[in-house]
Regions:
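Positively charged n-region of N-terminal signal peptides that target proteins for export
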Residues: 1-7
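Bacterial N-terminal signal peptides
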Residues: 8-19
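Boundary at the C-terminal end of the N-terminal hydrophobic targeting segment
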Residues: 17-27
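All-beta strand scaffolds that present successive hydrophobic residues in beta-strands
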Residues: 34-45, 54, 62, 67-71, ...
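Glycine-centered low-complexity coil/loop motifs and glycine-rich tracts
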Residues: 45-51, 59, 73-88, 99-113, ...
Length: 228
């Protein structure tokens, strides 16, 4: 094999890795050894299902199960015309380093972009909740949703829009720690979505947290306070 042919085959392989696209739900098994697994191809879910399901070994923690979404990769939950759009990424007990774009699927109610519990999320690019399409009574999806989550945000997290209903929250759940150096915004709608909505929250904000726009603007921060 001559040199020019070897270079041509190498470039073809690289372009295939970057540009190839999966359709339908994909499951990735993380290794639990603290070494990151990388997603280098875009993934789109179908029929309101998740795009990417995360599986982890038993008796491991989120610091040992690491997933990286690489630059120029798009992960989007499946669209549903009658129900909730699918999550972009769903899982429990893992770390997500996002350098691409993650979207919840559009639906009667928009899907959540990243959904699960016991997650550390480092967001270096964009996370979008899915758009709600159902009209009155429907809602956009949250950018991030779950319990026991740590969010390090350096770029943008958006709740999904719903022109006839309520915008989704940027981040929602309980027992959530947020370090924000970028923007966290609720989705737009008849009622604007909250920037952050939940209970037992610890927030350090160095940039912007904003509710979405609507006839009634969403709250920058909505807290549920329970008496002890």
């Amino acid at each position: 094999m001559n040199k020019k042919m070897r270079i041509s085959l190498f470039l073809t392989s690289v372009l295939y890795s970057v540009q190839s696209h999966f359709s339908g739900a994909q499951t990735i098994q993380l290794n639990g050894n603290g070494i990151s697994e990388s997603i280098i191809r875009s993934i789109t879910g179908t029929d309101g299902n998740e795009a990417l399901n995360i599986s982890v070994p038993p008796e491991t923690n989120y610091n040992e199960n690491i997933l990286s979404v690489e630059s120029s990769v798009n992960i989007k939950g499946g669209t549903s015309n009658t129900s909730i759009g699918g999550a972009g990424v769903y899982g429990v007990n893992f770390t997500l380093n996002n350098n691409g774009s993650i979207w919840g699927g559009d639906g009667y109610n928009g899907g959540v972009a990243v959904s699960g519990n016991e997650i550390l999320i480092r967001n270096y690019r964009n996370v979008y909740g899915g758009n709600g399409l159902g009209g009155s009574g429907s809602s956009g999806g949250a950018g991030l949703s779950g319990d026991d989550i740590i969010v390090d945000n350096y770029r943008s997290i958006y709740g999904g829009d719903d022109v006839g209903g309520t915008g989704g929250s940027g981040v929602t759940g309980s027992n959530i720690t947020v370090h924000n150096s970028g923007g966290i915004l609720g989705g737009n709608g008849v009622n604007g979505g909250d920037g952050i909505n939940g209970s037992n929250l610890f927030i350090t904000n160095d940039n912007m947290i904003s509710g979405g726009y609507g006839i009634k603007q969403g709250e920058m921060l909505f807290l549920e306070i329970k008496s002890l």
